Amino acid sequence: MIDGLRKKFIDFFVKNGHTYLPSASLVPKDDPSLMFVNAGMVPFKEYFVDVRRAPFSSIVTAQKCVRAGGKHNDLENVGFTKRHHTFFEMLGNFSFGCYFKERAIELAWKFVTEELTLSKKKLYITVYHEDDEAFEIWDKLTGFGERKIKRISTSDNFWQMGDIGPCGPCSEIFYDHGEHLSGDIPEDKKDPGERYVEIWNLVFMQYIREQSGELARMECPCIDTGMGLERVAAILEGTDDNYKTKLFEAIVKESQNVTGNKDNQAAHKVIADHLRSASFLIADGVLPGNTGREYVLRRIIRRAVRYSHALGFDTVLLPKLFWVLKEWMGSHYQELTRAENLILDTLTLEEQSFRNTLKSGMKLLEEVSSSMKEGDTLSGDIAFTLYDTHGFPLDITVDILKERKISVDEEGFAERMKMQRLLAQASRMKDMAQTSSYEVKAVFLEHGKTPFIGYENFTGLALILAITEKEGSNKLTIILDQTIFYPESGGQESDQGIIEGENTLLKVEKVYKSTEGVILHECTIIRGQVTSRGEKVNLKIDINRRNSLARNHSATHILHHVLRKRLGAHVSQRGSLVAPSRLRFDFSHSQSITEEELSKIEDCINLMIWDDHPVMTEIKKTDEAIRDGAIGLFGEKYDDTVRVVSIGEAVELCGGTHVKKSSAIGLVKILSASSVAHGVRRIEAVTHLTALQYIREAEQAQLYQLTEHQAKLKAMQKSHQKEITRVYQSIVTNAEARTERYGSVEIITKNVQGISKEILLSLASEIRPKTGVLIVHTELSEALYSLIILDKEIFKNISFIDSMKETIDKSHGKVTPSVPYVIQATFSKKEDLDRCLKNLSELVVSTF
C-alpha cells in the first residue's frame, strides 16, 4: 500500500506537468537554522524567495522528514497516539510561478476523489478566514458551502517562513473517520480530536512579510502542499491508526516475535517508529554523538532500547528488525541497501553501549523514586546526579517517570548543567591570562573585536590596550589593538613569537580569543618590563612554527576530503588537533579501517599534495558558501560571512592558517588509525620533514631489527649445528665397532649409515682416537666412503702415511685431500674396500 500510494501520487503530478525529484537528505544542505528536514518544502526554501533559482517551475516529491528535536519535536508523543511519528513521508507538489490557487485546489481535489476515490461525504475543507478567493474556488468545485468549508482565523491557516519573508494563507483537507471517534468539525477553538484528521495542507504563498510587519504581494506567487503518506495510507487501509497499517504491523509483529512479548503495544510502536527514523538518519550520514542532530539520533535509539528493556528483552533488538524495514521501503529508498552495513553496525554499537547504563540507571532511579507518588517532582539535583555520575540521560528519566505521573524539575537540572559548564570553562581558562572579564569587556566595548591581520603579515606594529601582570612571576597578558598572532581556534594551536617595545622583550607563548572576540596574548618577560598602556610595540611571529601549523592544517583539510571520498559522505569531523609537530583528526565512521585501505588513503592524500593545488581563500556569505558545497561543522556558530578555504576539491569553512600551495605540505605519513568512541575514529599523521624523519627512523629501526634478527638466526644456527654435531658424534661413537690389534697398534673399524662424508669429516677432530687408527665407513649413492683417522703418534710417521695412500691406490681406491691426520678414501666396489683393509692391516704389522 505504501509503495503504491507514493507511486500513484508521483505519477499523477508528473502526468499533470510536474517534474519528479527524489527525496533530499534528512540533513538540510544549506540551512543551518534547521536540525532536520521536517517538511516537504524545506529543500526548496530558497526558490520561494527567488523563483528564478528554481530548476523547474513545478515539482513533485516524496520527502523524508524527521520531527524529533528543536521546535518541531514529536518524540515524547510517539507510541501513545495514533498519528505521531519521528519519521514520516510528506507527499508534495510545488509551483514556482507556474500555477496558483485555483489549479492547486483542482489538482488536490481530483487526486483525493478520483485517484484515491475517497468519499466526498467524508471530506471537509478549511480556509483562512480572510481568503474569500480560496473559499469560492472550493465552493464552486465541491458545492460544499459553509457547512463543510470552514473559515479558520488562527495562525494554523496562515503560514510564514519566518518573521520576514514569503508567507500566505493555507487551506486544509480533513477526513472524517466516523462517529465512533470523538472530535469536532474543524473550526476555530474546536478540537478535531481523533475523528477528523488533516490529510493535505495547501499553502498559497502570495505575500512577503516586510520588516515593518506589512504584507506586500509577491511578484510570482508560489504553491507549497504537503500530504502525510502514513495518514492517507491508514485511510486507504480502513483504519484510523497509522500503526495499524501494513508497514507498521510488519515491524511490530517482528518485534513481538523477536522479544517474545506481545503485550505493551506502546513499546512496540515506539520501537517500530524509532527503527525507521534511526535507520534513515544513519543512511543520510548522521551518527550518534553528544551534540546537535547526533545527540537527537542517540536519544531516538536509546528510547527504543528503553522500551525494548521494558519488554524484558536484554539484547540488541533494532538490527534484528531492520530487514523488515528494508523489505518494505528499500525498493524506493535504495540508501537503506547502500548503507545497510553502516546502519546495522551503528545500531548494534549504540544499543550495546547503552544497555549496561540503562540497567544500572533504572535501578538507581527506582531507588531514588520508590517513595514518590503521583504528582510528585523529582529534584533537578537528583536527575543531574543520575546523568553526570551514572550517565543516565535526562530524557529517559523524564520518560520513565512520566508513566508514573511524576514530573522532573528540568529547570533545576538545567541550572546544575549550566553550573558544571561554567566550572569546566573556568578550569580550562585558569592558565589563561588573569585579565579580568571586566577589562576584556571594557576593551570590547571601546574597540570591538581584535582585528587579525596575520594571514599575510608575519611582522607588524600594534598598540597595547590592556596589560595584566601575574603577581610574583614574569608572566603577563596583553591585549593589542590588532595582532598578527593567530589565536587557538578550530583545533589549531596558536602562534608564538615575540613582542618588542622600546625597553621590553616579551615571548608570546599562548594566544586565546574571548567569547567577545578579543584576542589575549600570554607572554613571558625576557627583558625589561611593559611600562604603560598605549605603548607601541613590534610584533614578530615564529615563522617556523607558523609554517608547520599551516602545513598540518592544510593536510587536515585534504585528509577530510579523501576520507569522505573513499569511505563515504557520512564522514564528518568530530574533533581535531593541528599542532606544529603533528595532526589529529576525529571523524564519524563505525567500521575499522584496514591497513590496505589506510595505505590507499595515504596515497590519495599525497597525490593531492603533489598535484600542487593552489590554496585559495575567499570571503562569502555563509548560506552561499554552504550551498556551493563548502563543508561546515554542525553546531559551529558562523557569522553572516565566512572564510572559505579551497584546496582542489577540498572546500571548507575555515579561519585557520594555510600553505599557499598543496605541494608545500611535502609529504603526509599516517602514524595510526584507532577508535576513540562508538562510531568515531581517529587518524594521527605527520607532514613535511617530520614525515621524512619518521620514515627514515622507521627504515633504520627495520634495518636494526633485520641485523638483530640475522644475528639471532646465526646464533640459533650455530646452536643448532652444535646440537646436530653432538647427535652425529653420538651416532658414530656408539656405532658397533670391530677392534683388531696388530702389535702395538689398534685398528677400530665402524660402519655407519645415513651420514654424509661432509658431516663425517667435520666430526674428525671430535672422534679422533687417542691411540691407533679409526676407520669409519658409510655408503654413498654411487660409492663406498672411508674416513681414516690417525692418532698423534702415527700421524708423525710420514713414510707410513705415504705407504697408506699407496696401498689405497693399489686397491683401486681414490684418495681425497683432507686435514693432515685424516685420509679420505672412496671405493667403487666393496671387494676393493675389503682388499684395502686387509693390505692396511699388513702394512701396520710390517711398520710397527
Swiss-Prot record:
Catalytic activity: tRNA(Ala) + L-alanine + ATP = L-alanyl-tRNA(Ala) + AMP + diphosphate
Name of the protein: Alanine--tRNA ligase
Chief subcellular location: cytoplasm
Family: Belongs to the class-II aminoacyl-tRNA synthetase family.
Keyword annotations from UniProtKB, A to Z: Aminoacyl-tRNA synthetase, ATP-binding, Cytoplasm, Ligase, Metal-binding, Nucleotide-binding, Protein biosynthesis, RNA-binding, tRNA-binding, Zinc
Binding-site positions, Zn(2+): H553, H557, C654, H658
InterPro entries (alphabetical): aa-tRNA-synth_II/BPL/LPL, Ala-tRNA-lgiase_IIc, Ala-tRNA-ligase_IIc_anticod-bd, Ala-tRNA-synth_IIc_core, Ala-tRNA-synth_IIc_N, Ala-tRNA_ligase, Ala_tRNA_ligase_euk/bac, Thr/Ala-tRNA-synth_IIc_edit
Any Gene Ontology biological process: alanyl-tRNA aminoacylation
Free-text note regarding domains: Consists of three domains; the N-terminal catalytic domain, the editing domain and the C-terminal C-Ala domain. The editing domain removes incorrectly charged amino acids, while the C-Ala domain, along with tRNA(Ala), serves as a bridge to cooperatively bring together the editing and aminoacylation centers thus stimulating deacylation of misacylated tRNAs.
GO molecular function: alanine-tRNA ligase activity; aminoacyl-tRNA deacylase activity; ATP binding; tRNA binding; zinc ion binding
CC cofactor: Zn(2+)
Keyword Cytoplasm annotated: yes
Domain of life from the UniProt record: Bacteria
